[in-house]
């Protein structure tokens, strides 16, 4: 009797174990189906194809809610413009970052580095450009009298191109404390100059919102 009871107990446990180890099979037929899953270390393209993703490594946490902008100097130091406390952080090539300066503004929406190592940081919604020296001391370089400054670029002659909003104007600032009137490069009649970039020939390109234009100067 005990032998029979033991046999049936083992048999029941076997079937429970077998049932629990059965593989689950499902199929997906669209990108939206794939996106319902948790993508780990893979990329999903517009057609739903899954490929290995580049390895991502966290090197520094600013403890700020936003990182709005970044720039790299000749030595490989990375400067991060953040919000909403208006702080700029410096991360050397080794990755041990630290606070570079606190601008006492809301957002640092653009950062650029000049050839001499000076860092320029633009703020929003107060529309100012600060020059920051190697010690982290910041002074107002240009007051655009605009609500937003979205973009900066250092021109070949060292002047600073400044892209603004909400009036969509581009300024070229050649010296500290220059006025907006004397620095106006172009009024696009669009709302915002979201991005500025230079090519190897020194031509300036501007990308706008809300008409999505690309302008060359």
For each feature predicted by the language model, list its residue ranges:
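Surface loop/turn motifs at the tips and blade-to-blade linkers of beta-strand repeat domains
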Residues: 59-63, 100-104, 141-145, 185-189
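Blade/loop signatures of beta-propeller domains
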Residues: 23-55, 130, 171
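Short loop/turn segments that connect beta-strands within beta-propeller blades
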Residues: 91-96, 132-137, 173-179, 217
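Conserved beta-propeller blade signature
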Residues: 77-80, 118-121, 159-162, 203-206
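Conserved beta-strand position repeated once per blade in WD40 beta-propeller domains
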Residues: 68-69, 109-110, 151, 195
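Residue-level detector of Asp-centered blade-edge/turn motifs that repeat once per structural unit
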Residues: 72-75, 113-116, 154-157, 198-201
């Amino acid at each position: 009797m005990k032998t029979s009871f033991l046999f049936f107990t083992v048999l029941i446990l076997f079937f429970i174990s077998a049932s629990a180890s059965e593989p689950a099979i499902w199929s997906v037929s669209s990108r939206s189906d794939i996106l319902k899953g948790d993508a780990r270390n893979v990329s999903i393209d517009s057609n739903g194809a899954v490929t290995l993703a580049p390895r991502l490594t966290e090197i520094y946490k600013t403890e700020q809610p936003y990182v709005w902008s970044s720039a790299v100097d000749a030595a490989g130091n990375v400067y991060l413009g953040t919000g909403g406390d208006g702080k700029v952080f410096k991360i050397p090539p080794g990755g041990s970052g630290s606070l570079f300066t606190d601008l006492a503004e809301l957002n640092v929406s653009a950062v650029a580095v000049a050839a001499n190592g000076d860092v320029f940081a633009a703020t929003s919604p107060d529309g100012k450009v600060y020059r920051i020296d190697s010690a982290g001391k910041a002074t107002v370089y240009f007051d655009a009298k605009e609500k937003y400054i979205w973009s900066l670029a250092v021109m070949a002659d060292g002047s600073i191109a400044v892209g603004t909003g909400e009036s969509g104007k581009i300024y070229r600032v050649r010296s500290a404390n220059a006025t907006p009137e004397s620095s106006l490069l172009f009024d696009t009649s669009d709302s915002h100059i979201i991005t500025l970039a230079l090519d190897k020939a020194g031509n300036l390109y501007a990308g706008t919102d809300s008409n999505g234009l690309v302008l060359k100067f």
